[in-house]
C-alpha cells in the first residue's frame, strides 16, 4: 500500500467540516479507515464497491462491449446506483469513471448528478498517463483529510483517457469543475452540482 497527499480530498473535507450530518456516497467499497474518518465528522456514509459491481455485470466476456448491452446496463445501474434523487450531499467517486465506455459513462454521470443535492460536491480521480495501455486500480482509503491510502487492485484497460477539456465536457451540466495539480499519475477533480 502507498499513501499520497491529496489537495482535492482536503478541499472536499473542508466542505464537510462546515456542515455536519451530511449523507455521503463512497464508491471505493466499505473500509474501516474511511468510515471512521467520515462518521467521526458526524456524517452518514453509504458505501459500494463500484468496480466490483462493474465486474459482476460486465466481466463475463468483453468488459467494454458488455457495457452496450441494455440488460446488463440496467442490471448494473440497479445494483450500483439505485438511490433516490437528491439523496446525497457528496460523493467520493475516485477513479471509477475511467472504466465506463461512452454512453454508459454519460448515463452514470447523469445519475450521479441526479442523486446529489444542489450545491453538493463530488471528488473524482483520473489517471494522467495517456499512453499507458493499462493503468493501476486501487481501493482508496481516507487516512486523514489530506492523505489517501491506495491499496492496489491490479491493472485495467481504461475505456478512455481524460484531459481537462474532456472532463469539462463530461461535467458540463454541473455548476463547476475544479482541477488540482498533482506530482504523480493522478488528476484530482472536484465537481459541484
Task: Name each region found by the language model.
Residues 1-16, 21-24, 31-82, 121-193:
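Class I (Rossmann-like) S-adenosyl-L-methionine-dependent methyltransferase catalytic domain
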Residues 30-32, 98-99:
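Gly/Ser/Thr-rich loops at beta-strand to alpha-helix junctions
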Residues 88-106:
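A short SAM/SAH-binding and catalytic strip from SAM-dependent methyltransferases
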Residues 27-30, 104:
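Short, glycine/acidic-rich beta->alpha junctions
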Residues 80-87, 113-114:
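Short, charge-rich binding segments
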